[in-house]
């Protein structure tokens, strides 16, 4: 009897081979897919040997074309040929029309305000268009690798917001792809260069694509990538170079706006071809609808110089945020096809004081980094020494008096990371402190998830507020959290380890984030009330302790009775629900006890100076 070999989904048909995974660079202008094969990460090509797939989809009545075939239809069918859909994903129609008023597409608005593109094949939204691009890349990967993909890593610009990231994941789901992770494009480039060149030190990743610009300042050390700062512009890229040159050519040719959609697309194609030619030529001859002329690289560079300067302003801000000087940067990594523009390389080189690094194809570096990470996330490198970059999905905080949450590490912080904060004691003579670690976005402990508790003992007895306890939260690249509490004067410390993400599904994380937004106003009101109650308790306890210590000596019976009434009034307010009333009660109590506090101060000064001469002071 013949035996049929059935491969497990996500595995190749040959036994003992790794799971199949791919990294996808879903770009504004072009997209690529890469995978690790025989230990090397390489981009995967189509049947004509091309690694790049133009991010273009053409919708005919019965068929959808993707890539080069679709791009060829752009001039004849601009309304049915969707280009740079990445700019549209996650945005409302109103936002799109304000940002890109000259798009040739026929839009209509959906019930929830999202854009619908009207094509010959019917209505399409940006997620569906993106899905068609992803489907084409997924098919290429499966045909090349010879099996079903276990999952993919898709790269996104660092500045993509939640809606844009969610739209990208939805597009992948629609394309039938399992998303292992969304990865920031500059981070993907750092992964590729970190493995290939083994750099250590501060690296700047300058990523100028077709539609977006990102700058990331990274520290690379022993296989660990630490993100120091990011910046950029989600609406600036090589497409803008094309538009500026197209406007210039239109002016030189004496054409009047607006052009028809077909002519507009043709003009952009001429501008793009001219821009590419400037990488090798100083002067390019052009033919714009019968007008023949020449454009020099110097003229082109003067047009785009303000945009390149704008990117360098973002670089300057990112360096400032990272507390790093430009001369401290070891390498400037160039990513994105638009970095082939000579002026970009020259100005970036001048800014950082060194020749930019371009040893990996700038079009492919992001996809290669994504492919490397996909291979690891699929479980193909269990012993890999590379520490994966990730972000903390929910904030990590500590419980303070009154059941409040003080956030130590905010959500979306890249790991590995360490943050510290100082706290103090609440009561006189306090010798121990309970450290309660929580996870979540809400303001009150009861609304967050408890992770761990431990106690720091051996704090020297002091007056309230005198002790200094430094609490450090450290999350390593595996998501393992270490919490350390140390009393600074004695060095006594305690610590605990916990895995923050354990037991939380994506849905639970999403629900916690949703609740933090839904109850934001109520949470802030509850926090304000709790803070005032804590302050009231401090004032009440302090005043009672002072009266017990010095009341009989410094206060008359009537004064003691008056202060007792003030304390009772504050206690009543403290037990109420009005934060403003408690705040006013605290002010009234401080005012009523001011004279008593002055007498105690005088007494302390007299005691300190007792028996001393003027020469001793």
Curated annotation (Swiss-Prot):
The keyword Nucleus does not apply. Keywords: ATP-binding, Chaperone, Nucleotide-binding. Pfam families: HSP70 (PF00012). The keyword Manganese does not apply. Disulfide bonds: none annotated. InterPro entries: ATPase_NBD, Heat_shock_70_CS, HscA_NBD, HSP70_C_sf, HSP70_peptide-bd_sf, Hsp_70_fam, ISC_FeS_clus_asmbl_HscA. One of its GO terms (biological process) is iron-sulfur cluster assembly. It comes from the Bacteria. GO terms for molecular function: ATP binding; ATP hydrolysis activity; ATP-dependent protein folding chaperone; unfolded protein binding. Belongs to the heat shock protein 70 family. Chaperone involved in the maturation of iron-sulfur cluster-containing proteins. Has a low intrinsic ATPase activity which is markedly stimulated by HscB. This is Chaperone protein HscA homolog. It comes from Vibrio campbellii (strain ATCC BAA-1116).
């Amino acid at each position: 009897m013949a035996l049929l070999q059935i491969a497990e989904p996500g595995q190749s048909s040959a036994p003992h081979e790794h799971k199949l995974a791919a990294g996808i660079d879903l770009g504004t202008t072009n997209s690529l897919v890469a995978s690790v094969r025989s230990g090397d990460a390489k981009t995967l090509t189509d049947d004509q040997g091309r690694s790049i797939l133009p991010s273009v989809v053409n919708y005919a009545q019965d068929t959808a074309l993707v890539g080069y075939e679709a791009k060829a239809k752009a001039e004849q069918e601009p309304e049915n040929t969707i280009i740079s859909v990445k700019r549209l994903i996650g945005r409302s129609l109103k936002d799109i029309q304000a940002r890109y008023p000259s798009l040739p597409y026929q839009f209509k608005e959906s019930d929830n305000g999202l854009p619908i593109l009207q094509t010959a094949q019917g209505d399409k939204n940006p997620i569906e268009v993106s899905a068609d691009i992803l489907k084409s890349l997924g098919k290429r990967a499966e045909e090349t690798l010879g099996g079903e993909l276990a999952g993919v890593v898709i790269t996104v610009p660092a500045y993509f917001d939640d809606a844009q990231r969610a739209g990208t994941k939805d597009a992948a789901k629609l394309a039938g792809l399992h998303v292992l992770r969304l990865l920031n494009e500059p981070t993907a480039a750092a992964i590729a260069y970190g493995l290939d060149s083994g750099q250590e030190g501060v690296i700047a990743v300058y990523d100028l694509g077709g539609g977006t610009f990102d700058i990331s300042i990274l520290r690379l050390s022993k296989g660990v990538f630490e993100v120091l700062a990011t910046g950029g512009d989600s609406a600036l890229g090589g497409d803008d170079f094309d538009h500026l040159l197209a406007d210039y050519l239109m002016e030189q040719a004496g054409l009047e706006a607006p052009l028809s959609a077909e002519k507009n697309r043709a003009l952009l194609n001429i501008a793009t071809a001219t821009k590419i030619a400037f990488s090798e030529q100083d002067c390019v001859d052009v033919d714009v609808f019968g007008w023949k002329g020449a454009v020099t690289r110097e003229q082109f560079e003067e047009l785009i110089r303000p945009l390149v300067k704008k990117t360098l302003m973002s670089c300057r801000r990112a360096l400032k945020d990272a507390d790093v000087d430009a001369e401290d940067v070891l390498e400037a990594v160039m990513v994105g096809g638009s970095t082939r523009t000579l002026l970009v390389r020259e100005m970036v080189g001048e800014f950082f004081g060194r020749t930019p690094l371009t040893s990996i194809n700038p079009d492919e570096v992001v996809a290669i980094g994504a492919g490397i990470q996909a291979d690891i996330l699929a479980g193909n490198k269990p012993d890999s020494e590379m520490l994966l970059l990730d972000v903390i999905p929910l904030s990590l905080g500590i419980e303070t008096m009154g059941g409040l949450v003080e956030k130590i590490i905010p959500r979306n912080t890249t790991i590995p990371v360490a943050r510290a904060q100082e706290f103090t004691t609440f009561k006189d003579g306090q010798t121990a402190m309970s450290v309660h670690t929580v996870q979540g976005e809400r303001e009150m402990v009861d609304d967050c998830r408890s992770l761990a508790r431990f106690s720091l003992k051996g704090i020297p007895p002091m007056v309230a507020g005198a002790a200094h306890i430094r609490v450090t939260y450290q999350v390593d690249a595996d998501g393992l959290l270490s919490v350390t509490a140390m009393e600074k004067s004695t060095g006594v410390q305690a610590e605990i380890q916990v895995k923050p993400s354990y037991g939380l599904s994506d849905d639970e994380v999403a629900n916690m984030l949703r609740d933090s937004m839904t109850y934001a106003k109520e949470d802030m009101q509850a926090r304000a009330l709790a803070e005032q109650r804590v302050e009231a308790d401090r004032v009440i306890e302090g005043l009672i302790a002072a009266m017990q210590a010095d009341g009989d000596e410094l206060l008359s019976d009537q004064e003691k009775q008056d202060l007792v009434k003030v304390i009772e009034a504050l206690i009543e307010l403290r037990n109420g629900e009005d934060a403003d009333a408690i705040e006013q009660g605290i002010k009234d109590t401080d005012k009523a006890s001011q004279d008593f506090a002055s007498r105690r101060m005088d007494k302390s000064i007299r005691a300190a100076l007792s028996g001393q001469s003027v020469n001793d002071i």
